[in-house]
Curated annotation (Swiss-Prot):
Role of this protein: Dioxygenase; part of the gene cluster that mediates the biosynthesis of hancockiamides, an unusual new family of N-cinnamoylated piperazines. The NRPS hkm10 and the NmrA-like reductase hkm9 are proposed to convert two molecules of L-Phe to the intermediary piperazine called xenocockiamide A. Xenocockiamide A is then converted to hancockiamide D via a series of hydroxylations and O-methylations.
Protein name from the UniProt record: Dioxygenase hkm4
Annotated GO MF terms: dioxygenase activity; metal ion binding
Main EC class the enzyme belongs to: oxidoreductase
Industrial or biotech use: Hancockiamide D displays potent cytotoxic activity against murine myeloma NS-1 cells, suggesting a potential antitumour application. More interestingly, hancockiamide C, the likely end metabolite of the hkm pathway, shows potent Arabidopsis thaliana seed anti-germination activity, but is inactive against the monocot Eragrostis tef seed, suggesting that it could be a herbicidal lead targeting monocots. The herbicidal activity of hancockiamide C could be due to its phenylpropanoid-like structural features, which may act on the plant lignan pathways, and hence warrants further investigations.
Keyword flag Oxidoreductase: yes
GO biological process terms on file: biosynthetic process
Listed cofactors: Fe cation
Pathway info: Secondary metabolite biosynthesis
UniProtKB keywords: Dioxygenase, Iron, Metal-binding, Oxidoreductase
Family designation: Belongs to the PhyH family.
Amino acid sequence: MSIPSGTEPQIKRFSVTADPDTIFQAYQEDGVVIIQGFLSPEQLDKFNREVNPRLAHQRQGYQPSLKARLMEGSLSALLPPQQKRVHNLAGFSKVFRHDILNHGLMHELCRRAFAATGDYWLSSGAVIENGPGTPEQGWHRDQPSYPVIQAGPGTAEGMVNFFTALTDFTAEAGATQFMHGSHKVVGIPDGDPNHPMLIAEMKAGDSVLLSGKLVHRGGLNNTSDFFRRALSLAISPCVLTPYESSIHLSRPLVESMTPLAQRMIAWRSASIPPPYQIGMWTLNMNEVGEEMGLKYNQPYDEDEE
């Protein structure tokens, strides 16, 4: 369906206190909505103060990983030098643990988005800071397109993201850009007048909720001194999670196993093939076992089991 002349679409905006059904209906129609005041001023201030030292540490030249060696396919190695990312938010942020992960409206919308597949959980929580000169991203979707999980228009959601502004988002500083209606088509409709580009300019504390099927990109930070900061809160359904959990196993027992066996019970990271080809189940964008100092092939008294 073509867009009538003179009716340029806009990203719909809602207060954090708005009716969840109304917000979700707009989200289904457009693949994206802006929630104003998603974080309160107090939450925003406290969270930024929790994150500041870690970003400053990286700006001084330190890597987010605790280890010198990065796993093959580490996301860290793919980032432009102007961009810094902080992961493992639950490990140090009280606001993240107690406020953000319990956000009432976030859960109301997630329950609706994943109604067809059941429970959902955090896929990735990261603070992303784009400094001056951070280049424009290529157009992409967040939802992977591998055949086993490929979901096109009209199918269940494979991922949603509450992409929350921790500083003001302006076009000049590279505010996120979207292809209107692209969650309803196959492919990337670049240059299609029926899918014009929209820019999510926001105030700090606002959040843009986007479908994993929506084509988008981060814009060029064309400022000389502004660091655009965001919280990426990616949520995914639990349907491809292993049936059995091995989180209860003792570390000495796990360290008696080979790295391959450790990966089979989710004590090691995994990799996926191109076009994404990044590590999965990681810590600080690196191999989780390496970050934890996990040993392998260690002696173990089997009689203690």
